[in-house]
Amino acid sequence: SYRILTEKIFGSNHPYGYNSTEQNIRSVGTPDILSHWQLNYQTTDSFIIVAGNVTNTILQKIEDNFGHIGLKKTPTRTDLKDIERDMRPIKSFKLEKTQSSVKIGIDCVSRQHDDFDGMFVFNTVLGGYFNSRLNNVIREAKGLTYNIFSTHDTYLYGGLFYISADTSQDQVIKMNTEIYTQIDKLLDKPIPKAELERVRGYLLGTLMTSFDGVYNCVETLRSCLIEGVDFASVQQLINKIATIETTEVMETGRRNLSIDNLIEVVIG
């Protein structure tokens, strides 16, 4: 369901929507892998991150082992924002299965966008953690699914916001209706203060782990570099979480989510 969702949102010819097939994989040979490595990894965009107790001896060993590798100029890349996307709504794909996997999504902002921090909070309230609205209402209170969450995937050129859930075939319509109801409520009604404070505490606590030890620090820096944002953006995100008010969460959601444009995929 995820593969179909990304294809329908971004388009089958878009790198974020392209899906490989068995035939594609079988046709790949060693020369193809080597060429891909040279064009996309062995370039001037490549970097090495070293953290911890780094001595001059360690730096010299890194230089001795990697400094001789010839890097090619990074090729001109197509700005993926300019690639035409296939946004034709596809409501469902039916297979003979007793269980159904549901994905409901829309293309969204990247980490470079001003709305990212607000969407980070919006997603958490809706379905980004165990005490989220989707989980509390649809899983815990109504028992319509055994697994539901929302997530905001971000890439260098854009992002993807989607809701994922699994349920029995006879509960799909009822569950999806409730999903849209919860989205509507979050877009239209202020978040209670206690709920927003709970989300703040959860997110700030979670982000602390991003700097817990050298390995987590390296991973945090790596993700910033790959997605085209400064390391200071993490502190900006923390500041936004600590100060954002319910009105801003609602307004950010309205700018980036439209129920009429959501694409729904049902497998099973």
Where are these regions (language model features)?
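Charge-rich, well-structured scaffold segments of protease-associated domains
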Residues: 1-74, 110, 118, 140-268
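Generic alpha-helical structural context detector
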Residues: 6-7, 123-127, 136, 223
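His/Glu-based metal-binding/catalytic segments typifying zinc-dependent metallopeptidases
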Residues: 74-131
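M16/MPP (pitrilysin/insulinase) zinc-metallopeptidase core fold and M16-derived inactive scaffolds
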Residues: 125-144, 155
